[in-house]
């Protein structure tokens, strides 16, 4: 894996060019490599995840995390799909201003224009990261426990409790299309204006007819009486 330049889950995600049917983000801030660097997950998990990613569909995905994971994503996850003219050559990390809880502070733009924002609570601050023309998808994420066969450092096989990060299918889609919205607003305004003009014209004609009728009636009354 190292020879391919893939030493953590983020590199793997960038390498395989995630699309709308393969949406995964794993963050384990307590997992380090031999040099003390945070790597997210080890090679053994990464190889398994790499295979699973290629086979998963949009119906939902399940991530098996190491048993010593102390913190895992839980709540909601946003996928922000940038248009082709916003593509970046390398991942970009943005820290949200005013965040002191450490929740919702990571936003990544992958090299294919797909971004992810993860947080434990739904936060409206994500809107500051979305530009006109972006497509935003919302996924529900939960953490579950299950029994799995594992291998320890000595090579011994045992059945231990593992944490599973479950990513649901797409539960909500938000289209940020200001151009389309503006066109729609202008179109509705034109319809309203035409309706107002027609209504005003008809109303004016009706008023004129009423005035003429009243004047004729008064004239007839003065003649015959």
From Swiss-Prot:
Name the UniProt record assigns to this protein: Uncharacterized protein pXO1-111/BXA0163/GBAA_pXO1_0163
Membrane topology field: Single-pass membrane protein
Major subcellular location class: membrane
SUPFAM superfamilies found in the cross-reference section: Anthrax protective antigen
Species this protein is from: Bacillus anthracis
Protein location: Cell membrane
GO cellular component: plasma membrane
Keywords from the UniProt entry: Cell membrane, Membrane, Plasmid, Transmembrane, Transmembrane helix
Signal peptide: none
Segments crossing the lipid bilayer: 181-203
Pfam families assigned to the protein according to its UniProt record, in alphabetical order: PA_Ig-like (PF20835)
């Amino acid at each position: 894996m190292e020879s391919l330049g893939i030493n953590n889950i983020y590199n793997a995600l960038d390498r395989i060019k995630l699309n709308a049917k393969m949406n995964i983000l794993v963050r384990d801030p307590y997992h380090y490599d031999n040099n003390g660097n945070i790597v997210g997950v080890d090679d053994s998990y990464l190889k398994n995840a790499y295979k699973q990613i290629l086979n998963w569909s949009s119906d939902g995905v399940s991530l098996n995390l190491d048993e010593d994971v102390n913190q895992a994503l839980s709540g909601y996850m946003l996928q922000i799909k940038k248009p082709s003219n916003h593509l970046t050559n390398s991942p970009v990390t943005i820290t949200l201003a005013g965040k002191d809880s450490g929740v919702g502070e990571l936003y990544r733009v992958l090299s294919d224009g797909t971004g992810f924002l993860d947080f434990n609570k739904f936060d409206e601050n994500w809107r500051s990261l979305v530009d006109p023309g972006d497509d935003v998808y919302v996924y529900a994420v939960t953490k579950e426990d299950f029994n799995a066969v594992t291998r320890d450092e000595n090579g011994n096989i045992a059945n231990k409790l593992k944490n599973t990060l479950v990513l649901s299918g797409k539960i909500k889609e938000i289209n940020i299309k200001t151009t389309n919205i503006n066109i729609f607003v202008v179109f509705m305004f034109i319809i309203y204006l035409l309706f107002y003009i027609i209504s005003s014209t008809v109303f004016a004609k009706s008023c004129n007819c009423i005035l003429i009728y009243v004047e004729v009636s008064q004239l007839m009354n003065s003649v015959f009486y």
